[in-house]
Design a protein with these regions (language model features):
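Short, cysteine/histidine-rich loop/knuckle motifs that typically chelate Zn2+
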Residues: 8-13, 37
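Short metal-binding segments enriched for Cys and/or His
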Residues: 1-2, 29-57, 63-71
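Short, non-ligating residues that shape and space the ligands of small metal-coordination modules
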Residues: 15-19, 44-45
Length: 145
């Protein structure tokens, strides 16, 4: 089972779904979350923060190193490593991808009851288009699609 959380950003106007691969890192590894509206409240520290299309996640690097070493991870622990390897990253491709996915499923629910094949094809078409847009916009996780 993998841990996930939905913390509010510093200004409390936005929230992001955050996923913790294999529950290796505890929730407290996220010190602060900054949305595009409140990111100016801090100076980006590359040694503790990852940036993704205007969002910043600030990690407690001591906590991250401790838990990753306990797990036997033999790799330099950086914010990029933590994020890109999924140890503490978006749940989906972006901060709100989980909600967007749920919205699409809800929207297509009537189709699912009528024609499952058409439902799956439409779901695939919509999600692939969304992923292409996320990639074009520059979302970090979407770049590997």
């Amino acid at each position: 089972m993998c841990l996930h959380q939905k913390p509010a950003c510093v200004c409390k106007r936005n929230k992001a779904y955050i996923f913790h691969r294999d529950s290796v890192l505890p929730e407290r590894v996220v010190i602060n979350l900054y949305c595009p509206e409140c990111r100016d409240r801090t100076n980006r520290d590359q040694s503790t923060m990852i940036e993704d299309v205007g969002w910043l996640i600030e990690y407690d690097m001591e906590v991250a190193r401790f838990y990753l070493e306990l797990k036997g991870v033999d790799h330099p622990v950086t914010p990029e490593f933590i994020f890109d390897e999924g140890y503490c990253t978006w749940y989906g491709m972006s901060p709100n991808d989980l909600e967007e996915n749920a919205r699409v499923h809800q929207e297509l629910l009537p189709l699912q009851k009528k024609d499952k094949l058409l439902y799956f094809n439409e779901l695939k078409r919509i999600r692939l288009a969304q992923f292409a847009e996320l990639k074009k916009t520059g979302w970090r996780k979407a770049q590997n699609i």
